[in-house]
Curated annotation (Swiss-Prot):
Subunit structure: Homodimer.
Motif (HCFC1-binding motif (HBM)): 230-233
Stretches for region Nitrobindin: 407-569
Keywords tagged on the record: Cytoplasm, DNA-binding, Heme, Iron, Isomerase, Metal-binding, Nucleus, Phosphoprotein, Zinc, Zinc-finger
Enzyme class: isomerase
One Pfam family, short name: THAP4_heme-bd
Composition skew (Polar residues), residue ranges: 121-130, 157-167, 265-279
Annotated metabolic or biological route of this protein: Nitrogen metabolism
UniProt organism field: Mus musculus
Cofactor note: Binds 1 heme b group per subunit, that coordinates a highly solvent-exposed Fe(III) atom.
Gene: Thap4
GO CC term, one of those recorded: nucleoplasm
Name of this protein: Peroxynitrite isomerase THAP4
Length: 569
């Protein structure tokens, strides 16, 4: 999978540039506060980041990264928040408005050419239509951003065309005013059709100022559509309501006369037929010699078109914008509320997903706990059964479970051996040596108990120290002759040896040696001939055992030594 940047209009992806030139960083999904800050900075609608969402390092300032070596991967600080997004947005906005202006200019050129074509109906009306069409076409060419390549018309050429048109239309012709009236009616009808077509086009696409409704209306938002309509109302409603109900045709003729008279003032030919409608408009104050010169600075096509439609109104577009500034501020605040509400909705959705995930994990943990409780309940039932059975071969259960009845009293005969009672574990591991064996270590567990009889029960169970596999095992009884210190040690081993050892107990020390040794017929050689044992309770309360033995090939030699610590009484 190729890692890409999740920012809008960012084309950075893994492997696109030089190595380590751009790094990618995951969204902090586990930190809810920091995740909300990242989402506010990215400003993506109806989008929720996942564990595969990244932002490239170009959206973070230099102080957002921790100081590391050059060959190490860049690491964000725990408080880093992306903040660099405005450059790409400005470039996108500039390109979009330029396209709108070019589109508006091209559309107005097409309408002007169509109007000029409709005006040339007959030979008697051609010269008058030239006077109506050429100022407008020249005005549009001057307002177009591509006016450098457009041909320019000089005032001399205009005056020459005016003279030719006046020569072709004699002033003493009684039908001339009627022809001019019909021509003006046709021109006004054509212009009305043009206004209807342009208004329908503006309703579908961009308005007169070159700003599209899509700039204020995010998709799928009824509140934003309403706010966008308020925007269009704030720019056009007041201007439309204050526009006078004067017919469009006289205003166009006045504007045409105002533009044509300064250009024709330098010409020596001054023709003013009393029957011509072109001389019926008095000169305005702006055309006086003391008035400032007309601003001929090239303007965008959208402003040129808007100025044509707003010359008849006492308010200019700047005055309209100034009068609507308060409304625009209110509408901008509504816009910010609308977008912030949508961002809050996306944040709530993200937090809701995290809560649902945590609830799922909690549910699985509860299921595991319930299963564990059922297992513990079953184990307790089994232990209760064992306790009720009071099995004699499980003496260690008396230390784990509360007794079902009172433990048996120690027989007074075995009182001198009471220091050996309990469960003992090797600490540290025991050591084994013999001339015919490799030295080794082992773990051992010892159980010495009684059931009220004049004897002790014992079992020795040894294990490997690493694998914990069972090794040597033996069990048996320790008997004490009444009113003496003479002791008999009877044991059976898993190696096939059965022995009887006898000795004496002196305080907390017991020494016994083999009295008879028996073995199975297929026991391993060399056979054991004699065994001695010594048990002692040291000053630390630990039990020590030392075992020596003699075989058919070796004399009496120490074989085992181990120390036990008591774990249960």
């Amino acid at each position: 999978m190729v890692i890409c940047c999740a920012a809008v209009n960012c084309s950075n992806r893994q492997g696109k540039g030089e190595k380590r030139a751009v790094s990618f960083h995951r969204f902090p999904l586990k930190d809810s506060k920091r995740l909300i800050q990242w989402l506010k900075a990215v400003q993506r609608d109806n989008w929720t980041p996942t564990k595969y969402s990244f932002l490239c390092s170009e959206h973070f300032t230099k102080d957002s990264f921790s100081k590391r070596l050059e060959d190490q991967h860049r690491l964000l600080k725990p408080t880093a928040v992306p903040s660099i997004f405005h450059l790409s947005e400005k470039k996108r906005g500039a390109g979009g408005h330029g396209h709108a202006r070019r589109k508006t200019t091209a559309a107005m050129r097409g309408h002007t050419s169509a109007e000029t074509g409709k005006g040339t109906i007959g030979s008697s009306l051609s010269s008058s239509d030239n006077l109506m069409a050429k100022p407008e076409s020249r005005k549009l060419k001057r307002a177009s951003p591509q006016d450098d390549a457009a041909p320019k018309v000089t005032p001399g050429a205009v005056s020459q065309e005016q003279g030719q048109s006046l020569e072709k239309t004699p002033g003493d012709d009684p039908a001339a005013p009627l022809a001019r009236g019909q021509e003006e009616a046709q021109a006004s009808a054509t212009e009305a059709d043009h206004q209807k077509a342009s208004s329908s086009t503006d309703a579908e696409g961009a308005d007169k100022s070159g700003i599209s409704m899509d700039d204020f209306t995010p998709p799928g938002s009824g509140a934003c559509k309403f706010i966008g309509s308020l925007h269009s109302y704030s720019f056009s409603s007041k201007h439309t309501r204050e526009r006078p109900s004067v017919p469009r045709e006289p205003m166009d003729r006045k504007r045409l006369k105002r533009e044509m008279e300064p250009r024709c003032s330098g010409n020596s030919v001054a023709q003013s037929p009393p029957s011509s409608s072109l001389t019926a408009t008095p000169q305005k104050a702006s055309q006086s010699p003391s008035a400032p010169p007309t601003d001929v600075t090239p303007k965008p096509a959208a402003e040129a078109v808007q100025s044509e439609h707003s010359d008849a109104s006492p308010m200019s577009i700047n005055e309209v914008i100034l009068s609507a500034s308060g409304a625009c501020k209110l509408i901008d605040s509504l816009h910010s509320y609308c977008f912030s509400a949508r961002q809050n909705k996306s944040q709530v959705c993200c937090l809701r997903e995290q809560v649902e995930k945590k609830n799922g994990e909690l549910k699985s943990l509860r299921q595991k706990v319930s299963r564990s409780d059922s297992q513990v309940r079953k184990l307790r039932e089994k232990l209760d059964e064992l306790r009720r059975a009071s099995l004699p071969y499980l003496p260690y259960l008396s230390g784990l479970l509360p007794p079902s009845h009172e433990p048996p009293k120690l027989n007074p005969v075995v009182e001198p051996l009471s220091w050996m009672l309990g469960t003992w574990l090797s600490d540290p591991p025991g050591v084994g040596t013999f001339p015919t064996l490799q030295p080794f270590q082992y773990l051992e567990e010892v159980h010495i108990s009684h059931v009220g009889q004049p004897m002790l029960n014992f079992s020795f169970n040894s294990f490997h120290p690493e694998t914990h596999k069972p090794m040597h095992r033996e069990c048996g009884f320790i008997r004490l002759k009444p009113d003496t210190n003479k002791v008999a040690f009877v044991s059976a081993q898993n190696t096939g040896i059965v022995e009887v050892e006898e000795g004496e107990v002196n305080g907390q020390e017991l020494c016994v040696s083999s009295h008879s040794v028996s073995r199975i017929s297929f026991a391993k050689e060399p056979h054991v001939e004699q065994i001695t044992r010594k048990f002692r309770l040291n000053s630390e309360g630990k039990l020590e055992q030392t075992v020596s033995m003699a075989t058919t090939t070796q004399p009496m030699t120490q074989h085992l030594h181990i120390t036990y610590k008591k774990v249960t009484p």
